[in-house]
């Protein structure tokens, strides 16, 4: 199994995502009119508050791992020598936030040699927390509160399908062209579904 120190670090990162979600919900639960172009719009405030919390707390865990985020992009010349880095999206699903359908997430990944080795997705409004570890599977938990154990997570069953049947989960209103090109190049058949499908029944169990 996972060592105690490793478990502690996973818990720390999961709690960072939960706390970032709390910051977003503080703003989400207020009544607001969104002016997308305004720098101090609620969406911008939620994004920045989440971003700042995640960065500060990740640095406390491991100050030597660089952080790449939409809020502070780093040029490729600098990034290409990174062996390991955090990739964060402090508020994924801005349209979902604006539409008030709750289908927005906090995303934190640890990338090593350009491949994700650990990732967290938290949908605070849906109280759904997912994490995955390379070679150890993916897990989910319903929670709005901070956690102190991994034992309550439910393992997500992964299908051993061929790549032709792999389902790709992405946010329908947050898809981008690069992602779509990558999917089409690597998978002959795919379904791009709204992240919300993760959050109904056990749809996540059907996804690879």
Regions found by a protein language model. Name each.
Residues 1-6, 203-206:
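Short, small-residue-biased leader/transition segments that mark boundaries at the very start
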Residues 4-91, 112, 146-149, 173-191:
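N-terminal subdomain of lithium-sensitive/metallo-dependent phosphomonoesterases centered on the IMPase/IPPase/PAP
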Residues 24, 47, 58, 94, ...:
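Residue-level signal for inorganic ion chemistry
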Residues 48, 71, 90-93, 97, ...:
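Generic detector of well-ordered alpha-helical packing
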Residues 75-77, 198-201:
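A short acidic, often aromatic-flanked loop/helix-cap motif at beta-alpha or helix-coil junctions
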Residues 79-80, 98-102, 132:
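Short glycine/proline-enriched turns and hinge-like loops at secondary-structure junctions
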Residues 87-111, 118:
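Glycine-rich active-site/cofactor-binding loop and its immediate structural neighborhood
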Residues 108-198:
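Acidic beta-strand-loop-alpha-helix segment within the catalytic core
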């Amino acid at each position: 199994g996972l060592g105690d120190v490793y478990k502690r670090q996973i818990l720390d990162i999961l709690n960072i995502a939960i706390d970032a979600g709390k910051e977003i919900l503080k703003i989400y639960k207020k009544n607001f009119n969104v002016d997308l172009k305004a720098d101090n719009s609620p969406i911008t405030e939620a994004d920045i508050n989440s971003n700042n919390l995640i960065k500060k707390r990740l640095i406390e865990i491991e100050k030597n791992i660089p952080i790449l985020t939409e809020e502070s992009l780093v040029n490729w010349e600098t990034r290409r020598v990174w062996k390991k880095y955090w990739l964060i999206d402090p508020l994924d699903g801005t349209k979902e936030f604006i539409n008030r359908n709750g289908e927005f997430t906090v995303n934190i990944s640890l990338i090593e040699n350009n491949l994700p080795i650990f990732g967290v997705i938290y949908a605070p409004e849906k109280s759904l927390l997912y994490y995955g570890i390379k070679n150890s599977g993916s897990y989910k938990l319903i929670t709005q509160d901070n956690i102190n154990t991994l034992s309550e997570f439910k393992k997500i069953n992964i299908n051993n399908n061929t790549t032709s049947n792999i389902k790709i989960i992405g946010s329908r209103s947050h898809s981008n062209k690069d992602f779509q090109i990558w999917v089409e190049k690597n998978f002959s058949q795919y379904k791009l579904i709204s992240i919300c499908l993760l959050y109904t029944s056990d749809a996540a169990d059907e996804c690879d």
